Amino acid sequence: MQTYDNPKVKYDWWAGNARFANLSGLFIGAHVAQAALTTLWAGAFTWFELSRYQSGVPMGEQGLILLPHLATLGFGVGAGGQIVDTYPYFVIGALHIISSAVLGAGALLHTFKGPENLKDATGPAREFHFEWDDANKLGLILGHHLLFLGAGALLLVAKAMFWGGLYDTTIHDVRVVTEPTLNPFIIFGYQTHFASVDNLEDVVGGHIYVGLLLIFGGVWHILVKPLAWAKKLLIFSGEAILSYSLGGIALAGFVAAYFCAVNTLAYPVEFYGPPLEVKFWYLRPYFADTIQLPYGNYTSRAWLANTHFFLAFFFLQGHLWHALRAIGFDFKRVEKALSAVETSS
């Protein structure tokens, strides 16, 4: 992290992973622990939503955010978009909670049994030791991340084509996708209007392309060292890598917010409520419901779209903050300058 030529910076507990920035073993342990917490939240909140679910009220009007996703994936849904079986939701919640325990055990193992620094490890683990200015090793680690992301995209393809199918709002039922779109002109033609996709074939075909491209990129980064132009263009430091990551998350958040707000194929009306409209409150944009609901109630679509939008906004601020620090900008100088102005006035 940026220390402004002070190598003895001490980070308190609230600084998170900055405490382990130069300890690759503990850094991995922290990441596994965060994955455990995320998975625990997913499982526990699925159960919480299941305990509050009312079969006589439209799912999109109950303020749920996880059960609609599971229904869209075709779990527990019958003809007409009716929820006919909630047991799959219970099982999925349980699997996530069990997985969180396994991940938590892995985090404890890395923290208390593994080496603090992977350069002291033996065997294959030593290969994953990294330094923030080592572009080659960062490329290797990036490659492995891309492999997992690609596998995740292809899992959706497998669910759509082989494991029961997805919910199709155009026929109000779950169906298997047998002929995904593979025409690259159709898939890449969505670049300017991606949120207008209106058929599962294009959605599944897009995931095939994304999954394969991610896997190809993963293999590339594992086998090929960063090229000269990339080393010249990019800054390789903990602060810079963090800023790149936050920028990517911000972009994904803005895309998800817009897609969720307007698209009714990936976010069916039956489970999320009708599309939203953009409104402004004292120049601040937000997505508003287009149906009348009791005071204080909002559709699942409104919750998801607005949450993604505002979180993406703050991730963008984090990206800019850390990007400026990565190039050497010291925010303390701003504070000192303002204090000097106040003193002189």
Swiss-Prot record:
Induction field: By iron-starvation; however compared to Synechococcus PCC 7942 and Synechocystis PCC 6803 induction is very slow.
Ranges annotated as spanning the membrane: 25-45, 64-84, 89-109, 203-223, 240-260, 309-329
Cofactor binding summary note: Chlorophyll a.
Keyword field: Chlorophyll, Chromophore, Membrane, Photosynthesis, Photosystem I, Stress response, Thylakoid, Transmembrane, Transmembrane helix
Localization annotation: Cellular thylakoid membrane
One CC-aspect GO term: plasma membrane-derived thylakoid membrane
Keyword Ligase appears in the UniProt entry: no
MF terms in GO: chlorophyll binding
SUPFAM superfamilies: Photosystem II antenna protein-like (SSF161077)
Membrane topology: Multi-pass membrane protein
GO biological process, one term: photosynthetic electron transport chain
Cofactor: chlorophyll a; all-trans-beta-carotene
Function as written in the Swiss-Prot or TrEMBL entry: Functions as an antenna for photosystem I (PSI) under iron-limiting conditions, when phycobilisomes disappear. In the (PSI)3(Isi3)18 complex most of the harvested energy is probably used by PSI; in other PSI-containing supercomplexes a large part of the energy will probably not be used for light harvesting, but rather is dissipated to protect the organism from light damage.
Assembly mode: Under iron-starvation forms a complex with PSI trimers, where the trimer is surrounded by a ring composed of 18 IsiA subunits.
NCBIfam families assigned to the protein according to its UniProt record, in alphabetical order: PS_antenn_a_b
Family of the protein in this entry: Belongs to the PsbB/PsbC family. IsiA/Pcb subfamily.
Record's protein name: Iron stress-induced chlorophyll-binding protein
